[in-house]
Amino acid sequence: MAENMLDASNVGIAKGREGGYACVAPAGTDPTTFIDMKKTLADFCKEPSAVLKSLGYISEDGVTITTDTDTDDKTDWSGVTIVSPMTSYSEGVEVTFLEARDTVLKTVYGDANVTSDNKGTTTVRHNKNFTGAHLFIFDAVVSDTKVKRVVIPNGVITERDDQEMNNSDLAGYTPTIKCLPSDFFDGDCMREYIYDTTTVAA
């Protein structure tokens, strides 16, 4: 059977998947545990031995995956570039978490910088001590029948964006997550899994 030259089922606008948009787990957690696309992130979080914790709502801007590369152009005698070897490669994620829940605060600012008392007050210390590495997972619906899961086994927050507090925008926390190579994924920084739900259901 000939391949379709055009297939609209592969086209869509990414939106958060029902059952949880994003979760976090301690560094060293085996990411292959969370590849079963029949399960939502909520399903994983409800398991008796669950290590995943929800990061709650994400802003309407969604999740941005960035790729940065550097190359070193090598020229011949006349100045013409003949080879351009890559000298560095990195990937990152930019996202705004909207909830001021403990999981978000501790992920962005570090466990030692977030404390809660028995009177309902949470204190968040702002300092140069960033949090360590975590496993991050993001779930999205990318078409009528397809869902995408992005798994980052070794994500380190390296930046915290400005906080906006005004009467028009939702307040949130916007970290930059640097995705480091992972032995779990044979040196890959992240992997994305795209599943056709009609196939999975079958």
Identify the function of each model-found stretch.
Residues V83-V104, S168-D183:
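Oligomerization/assembly interface segments of phage tail-like spikes and tubes
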Residues V80-V83, F138-A140, Q163-M165:
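Beta-strand-rich interaction surfaces with strong enrichment in secreted/lumenal proteins
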Residues F44-T96:
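A glycine-rich, hydrophobic loop/mini-helix early in the fold
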Residues D102-P153:
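Short helix-loop boundary/capping segments
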Residues K15-R17, S88-G92, T131-A133, T145, ...:
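A general secondary-structure signal for short beta-strands and their flanking turns/coil
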Residues M1-L55:
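Polar/acidic, low-complexity leader/linker segments enriched in S/T/G and N/D
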Residues K146-A202:
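Mixed-charge, glycine-accented linear interaction segment located at domain edges/termini
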